Amino acid sequence: REVYSVNVFAPLRLTQLVLPHFRPGARVVFVTSDASVEAYEGWGGYGSSKAALDQVAAVLAVEQPNLRIYAVDPGDMNTRMHQEAFPGEDISDRPPPEASVPGVREIISGHLPSGRYQARNLPVGADR
């Protein structure tokens, strides 16, 4: 229940509260995960909560066509959370969290249409 409160209900409620104050073209960015589309043993709650968040973003994009609604997957990273999720796996070859920053900046300042994106796969500056 807590994972859904944090990953689905809180972002949805916050968005509902600020939605009336947005101007056309405003952006809403949700942080998702590949666990929303890939099945990882033991990750049912987390993965399904991120899948629900992806759906929130998709429906909001249809309901609010004058806004840009994004679900952004920052990608696999060398973090404590990732290491704890995969104990015994060597994750030293994973990029640091900062590797996602250029893609996230593209979402925030570029001209991409609403949708779900993997931050590290975005061609930075390509849509300008």
Regions picked out by a protein language model, each given a short descriptive name:
Residues R1, L12, R27-P65, D76:
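Catalytic loop of short-chain dehydrogenase/reductase
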Residues T15, A57, V101-V104:
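Short-chain dehydrogenase/reductase
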Residues L17-A26, Q64:
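A short helix-coil junction within the Rossmann-fold of NAD(P)-dependent oxidoreductases
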Residues L67, A71-P74, T79, P87-R128:
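C-terminal helical subdomain
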